[in-house]
Amino acid sequence: MSAILKATNINKIYDEGAVSTQVLTGLDLTVTAGERIAIVGTSGSGKSTLLHLLGGLDTPTSGEVWLHGQLLNSMNETERGAMRNKHLGFIYQFHHLLAEFTAIENVAMPLLMRPEVSTAEARQQAIDILNSVGLEHRLAHRPGELSGGERQRVAIARALVTKPSLILADEPTGNLDYDNAQSVFGLLSELQSTMQTALLMVTHDRNLAALADRQLLLRNGHWENY
């Protein structure tokens, strides 16, 4: 199966004055279509940094990140943004929804960045995906009017509305209680399977990681045996 995402020899060093800190060292990773991968590690292990690099939100100090056969490192920010919008969906521990916009407006936003998609089309697609996550009765509600579990369902809908080939999820259930976490991850897994979208998930929860096809352990910036 062909690779959606391929990272080779990824290194990330942060310089603060005379002090250099190596956060990631020599990491390789390949993600194929429809695959579900969990990256496990404690706080400070470099998980979120790696996810940002893989999503083109930051660039590695050295190494290469390829998305659908195109080298993200060689692109400017506008080009990387277009690649993200076309191929990737993002879900965070904290939903990152815009407080002044309704659920429909938040979910439609990635589609409205595409000049070929009309406002009416974006709105209808947002309604359809919100219905699929069980929020047909909360379409006009703003984030402050939704529960934690509902906000994360809106975030999932926003990540999936563009029909991405890969979802990058950073602790997607980390801010929820156990019951909501199980419900939200079950929904995400179901939609991911139905849409044949790959999922790369960062988590410290080994029980959640066990539900993935493959588990990777990141410790002090290195891969270790899981």
Curated annotation (Swiss-Prot):
Q: Can you give the residue ranges of the ABC transporter domain?
A: 5-226
Q: Which GO terms describe its cellular component?
A: plasma membrane
Q: Which GO terms describe its molecular function?
A: ATP binding; ATP hydrolysis activity; transmembrane transporter activity
Q: Which Pfam families match?
A: ABC_tran
Q: Which InterPro entries match?
A: AAA+_ATPase, ABC_transporter-like_ATP-bd, ABC_transporter-like_CS, ABC_transpr_LolD-like, LolD_lipo_ATP-bd, MacB-like_ATP-bd, P-loop_NTPase
Superkingdom: Bacteria
One of the protein's GO biological processes: lipoprotein localization to outer membrane
Membrane topology according to the record = Peripheral membrane protein
Summarizing the function annotation, the protein's role is: Part of the ABC transporter complex LolCDE involved in the translocation of mature outer membrane-directed lipoproteins, from the inner membrane to the periplasmic chaperone, LolA. Responsible for the formation of the LolA-lipoprotein complex in an ATP-dependent manner.
Protein name, please? Lipoprotein-releasing system ATP-binding protein LolD
Organism field: Psychrobacter cryohalolentis (strain ATCC BAA-1226 / DSM 17306 / VKM B-2378 / K5)
Tell me what gene encodes this: lolD
